[in-house]
Amino acid sequence: MATRRYCTLVAAVLNTKTARKLISFGVKMVQKSPAVWRRIPPIYIDETAHPVTSNQDYDVPRLAKRVFDEAPRVERWFIESPCMRRIVEVQVMLPPRPEEPAPMLYLLDGVTAPRRSGWLREGQLEKGLNNEQVIVVMPTEASGSLYENWVADDPEVGRHQWDTFLTQELPNIMEDPTTGLKFNGRRIIGGLSMGASGAIRLAAKHPEFYHGAIGLSGCYSTTSAMGRGMTLAILRCVGSDPDNAWGTGPTPTWARNDVADHPEGLRNIPVYLFAADAHITKYDIELHTGRTRLDLPGATILEYASYTSTRDLERAMINAGMTHQVVHYQYGGVHAWEYYGDQLKAGWDAVYKSQVS
């Protein structure tokens, strides 16, 4: 376990300009060589749930079951999914006033994306949106999926067809009046980390479908050295083969999914982006004291990559003539759940409440 002294030492080392240059250099070198990135250990494999593809051929998506879950106003929905060929479990937080119409927020998880959404597990959804009139939809069991359609099933993580599920199958269920949900017609998508990358990418690819997007500490490039390196790390850390996601090497599919290279889809929808600069603060030292010794260095590297990527996306949007995006850079802070409740609220205010007030 990490002591306060250890965390203070990590901060002294990683808060230097030299360390930032070494992080960038290291990530760039890793992504260049398959012999290196294929050796990235599956550090999250014990924390994730990889549901087995049942190979069940469902004709249409259907709500098979709906039960109360562990938190107030939270239900678990079991969706028969034709594209995933299995039952996909989705956690749904109902609005505080269910008799009144509400928008839907599709809220995506980080890399582990287990059966219980991290937004609920870490208490940050309650912190950020508990009193907001919104239906929050949280897909689960999406470990390392990038929330994308993969070109092939993976022997470790199974079948991922999340683009189709999130933009076609799941909305058909959620917006069906027979569920009793009073939907006001507005859809927002958001997430943190891997979920931020997925949310912004899906919004850019389906701008006619979403009415706003929130990206918290995401990585939005798939072809830059930093972006490709972090994407490979996400895929390998859950034990999957990156070739099954978008193909082997720099394929056209990898290129198409680079939002920093193709930001045009974000032109006409509200966008909120957040990243901290990965400068380790006293608060971060307190947070990580008692955690594993790898947590603080890992959180620093992840947030530095997110910070770099967010700046790249903002620059691309500005160069394309976009000025509507709200981008918040925080001085101090690493990749840690404790920051995201407040930022979820800020993002919600920016992309939804400011548009309807």
Model-identified regions with their sequence ranges:
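Non-catalytic cap/lid and distal C-terminal segments of serine-dependent acyl enzymes
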Residues: 4-7, 11-13, 19-31, 36-357
